Amino acid sequence: NAGDPDREGQLLVDEVLYFVGNTKPVQRILLNALDEKSVKSALGDLRDNQDFHNLYQSALARERADWLIGMNLSRAYTLSERYKGNKVALPIGRVKTPTLALVVRRERELADFKPVDYFTVKILYTHENGTFWATWQPKDEQKGLDSDGRLINKGVAESLVQQLASSPDGVVKSVTKSKKKDLQRLPLSLSSLQVLAGKAYSYDPQTVLDTAQKLYEKKLTTYPRSDCEYLPPNQYGDRMAILSNLAQSGDEKLSQWAQNADRNIKSRAWNEKKITAHHAIIPTTVACNVNSLTQAERNIYFLISQAYIAQFYGEHVYEQTRIVVGQCEEEFVANGRVVIEEGWKSLYKRQKSKTNADGDEPDLTDERGAESGPKKDAIEEADHLPSVKKNDSVQYTDSSVESKQTKPPSRFTPSTLLQAMKEIHKFVKNEELKKQLKAVSGIGTEATRANIIDELISRGFMKTSGKKQVLSP
């Protein structure tokens, strides 16, 4: 049995063996990669196929559950609608129905959304070594706050500013400095590639999959339908050939990055224990001239190669400073962040969306999920703060009362909906279900999520609009 080393790979081959009535002994080979070293290693570690019978049963249960749910509930809901006079076929599926529900729920949240006006108070303090802005942190019992801790009474802000101006002396209550590191972003799985390409080029997930498949068929990149972001250590030796090829790829940025890469760095990506059925999508050792590719192929090859090269750049290192000022029995906080070593993030600076009309620059290093943002504003970070010590005196110099308004949750795009499918546990309140859904990496698979979104659109259950292809029911 040489099927993929996951439950679906086990099922596909075992079903054939059962169908033909095989009675001979069967051995199982577990292949995570198809390079010579990996294949030889797997051939030297063959297992009894019966050891994986539970994996087969797991996939069989999934297959039959999908069939029973689809066959029975699709008929039930379709007939129910026809009794109401609606001549419509309603396909119900274990994956497609909750996927559509995400879009419908977001639409209802938008319909029910009522913006809230609120205010932030910022104070400019002067210290002997320089000036800095600090943001007021109201106490929980402060009058004029809503249930989310936002100041909704402008009069409170204006009164505070007057009080501070009349008594301008402040003192530094604490100074906290910490050196922090951001590890190299991992190489790409299919879903992370689809999300990244959606941000960078507004490509829909199916376009990304189709393009990655073409690159795979040209032997320029590895297997595209992977859910893994790690690499087998026995492929670490291929880095020399891959980086040398990228240095001569014809793409100016890739060439420069590959030439400057530190080939002695071994990032966290090289981890045998984290490999699933397939390893992360990376460039192969086959040389590529990007000028021979279509624009879509070139863009997807660029993202895959960029993430691979990032493994050979250092960690992003920065110093974070937090200053707390006390004045008139209130606290004001200033945050500063100074980059010490740009590291791998130098590859992701000023990545501008090709189709973004409003000029926004998507953060291609952001690997957070698809949930809407925090309710409260984060304190802005300054590039530099003056050198201050605890108990130093500071003087109130100026103030700013900023009027803001809460923003509605963003509509899904095909790429963010795909990410939400993978992280469906974030949208579930039941703690037990949340754990189970997180353990199985959400609903759908790397190979099916894009197709499910496309099917919902083609059947008219969802529609896209605008350059960003936002989704609505």
PLM segments and residue spans:
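Toprim catalytic domain recognition across nucleic-acid enzymes
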Residues: 2-425, 431-461, 466-470
